[in-house]
């Protein structure tokens, strides 16, 4: 009898142990199980050093991404659809340090990345930081095409002065997005190498094309209450390896207000600097006086304003079919490439939480971005910040 009882106890203990081990391994490997949802079967896995995201960053992304996406959809005449956020990821320098920002892909119902939310720490000396707004948000198509190209692959996204790179598991580094540079001399003296150091210590990945269910919307729940933009604004070109941001800006604005396609950045720069050749021409910029002069030469009464234009001013000028050029200076550093930058105002809007925003086109990007109308600090796609210190309006 004792032998039978001992045998039964042994069997029960073995069963309990096997059950516990099974639960443990199922839990431990849950992330590696294949997804049943077809949209998730091919996911882009981006390498990250850790997945720690501050609560303030999560809250900002959750609360503001959908209204800004709805606005960009409307401004670009995209059909409204439901969206969700993918897993947050980071971008690294070649020394393996993060660029300091947090990135969330915005996915449509098919699982494609349509936009990217960039959340960056505000500079300590900025107006937003002094108001205890520790982070700023920007939504644009930045890197969306790149992430879609690497579906079902594991990559590390790297950046330096030359642009953005994808490092694949076979060790191949590919330049996927070029960053414009302001002058050839600075570029040649850049010390960053495009040969990455050992990145094997990056143990975790973010499945950026895998929806985060807690942020998923069953429909386009947010909408833009009011959108006012230059009727014929189109993005026909983006800035390459040159210093022609002002040329791109004025071309886009004049093409919009004249409803034409005859302006382009190179022809504008050639008109203003006819005697320059080669590298001197490619890496020349424009002064505010030259921008004023060109606008007036094209029949526009362009005017200089020594500050950011207000929301109401943008609204009135846009309604009157008058373009505005943003003159910005980089907050992080006044030296080197991208120290000064021009951008175009495409319009203004109110989203359904009552927030006033200004639609801006950065010549580096292939889409518009949303700027808080109460802040003169513009966070651009790569995480830098520009102080909107002056405007030229009337294009």
Swiss-Prot record:
Record: active site: 245, 341, 362
Site (Cleavage): 221-222
E.C. code: 3.4.22.-
Pfam family, one: Peptidase_C47
One GO term (biological process): proteolysis
Any single GO CC term annotated in Swiss-Prot or TrEMBL for this entry: extracellular region
Family matches, as Gene3D superfamilies: Cysteine proteinases, Staphopain proregion domain
Keywords, alphabetical: Cell wall, Hydrolase, Protease, Secreted, Signal, Thiol protease, Virulence, Zymogen
UniProt propeptide residues: 31-221
InterPro entries according to UniProt: Cystatin_sf, Papain-like_cys_pep_sf, Pept_his_AS, Peptidase_C47, Staphopain_pro, Staphopain_pro_sf
Modification after translation (UniProt): Proteolytically cleaved.
Residues in the signal sequence: 1-30
Membrane-spanning segments: none
Molecular function via GO: cysteine-type peptidase activity
Keyword Signal: yes
SUPFAM superfamilies to which the protein is assigned, alphabetical: Cystatin/monellin (SSF54403), Cysteine proteinases (SSF54001)
Protein's cellular compartments: Secreted, Cell wall; Secreted
Function: Cysteine protease able to cleave elastin, insulin, myoglobin, fibronectin, fibrinogen, HMW-kininogen, alpha-1-protease inhibitor and alpha-1-antitrypsin. Along with other extracellular proteases may contribute to the colonization and infection of human tissues.
Family membership: Belongs to the peptidase C47 family.
Identification of the protein by name: Extracellular cysteine protease
């Amino acid at each position: 009898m004792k032998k039978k009882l001992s045998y039964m106890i042994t069997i029960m203990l073995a069963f309990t142990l096997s059950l516990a081990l099974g639960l443990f391994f199922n839990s431990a490997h849950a992330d590696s199980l294949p997804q049943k949802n077809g949209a998730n079967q091919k996911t882009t896995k981006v390498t990250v050093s850790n997945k720690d995201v501050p609560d303030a960053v999560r809250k900002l992304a959750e609360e503001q991404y959908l209204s800004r996406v709805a606005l960009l959809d409307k401004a670009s005449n995209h059909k409204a659809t439901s969206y969700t956020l993918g897993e947050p990821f980071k971008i690294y320098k070649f020394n393996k340090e993060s660029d300091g920002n947090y990135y969330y892909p915005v996915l449509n119902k098919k699982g494609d990345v349509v936009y990217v939310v960039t959340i960056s720490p505000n500079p300590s000396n900025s107006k937003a930081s002094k108001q205890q707004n520790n982070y700023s948000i920007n939504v644009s198509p930045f890197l969306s095409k790149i992430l879609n190209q690497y579906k079902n692959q594991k990559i590390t996204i790297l950046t330096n002065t030359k642009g953005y790179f994808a490092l694949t598991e076979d060790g191949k580094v590919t330049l996927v997005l070029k960053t414009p540079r302001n002058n050839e001399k600075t570029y040649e003296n850049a010390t960053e190498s495009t040969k990455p150091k050992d990145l094997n210590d990056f143990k975790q990945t973010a499945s950026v094309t895998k929806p985060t269910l807690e942020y998923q919307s069953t429909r386009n729940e947010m909408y833009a209450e009011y959108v006012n933009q230059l009727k014929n604004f189109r993005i026909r070109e983006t800035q390459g390896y040159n210093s022609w941001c002002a040329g791109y800006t004025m071309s886009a604005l004049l093409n919009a207000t004249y409803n034409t396609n005859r302006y382009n950045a190179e022809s504008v720069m050639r008109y203003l600097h006819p005697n320059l050749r080669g590298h001197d021409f490619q890496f020349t910029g424009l002064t505010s006086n030259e921008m004023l002069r060109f606008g007036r030469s094209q029949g526009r009464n362009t005017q200089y304003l020594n500050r950011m234009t207000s929301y109401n001013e943008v609204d009135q000028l846009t309604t009157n079919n008058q373009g505005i050029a943003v003159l910005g200076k980089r907050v992080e550093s006044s030296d080197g490439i991208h120290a000064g930058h021009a951008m175009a105002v495409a319009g203004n809007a109110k989203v359904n939480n009552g927030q006033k925003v200004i639609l801006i086109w950065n010549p580096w990007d292939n889409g518009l971005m949303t700027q808080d109308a109460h802040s003169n600090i513009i966070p651009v796609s790569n995480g830098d910040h520009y102080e909107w210190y002056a405007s030229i309006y009337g294009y």
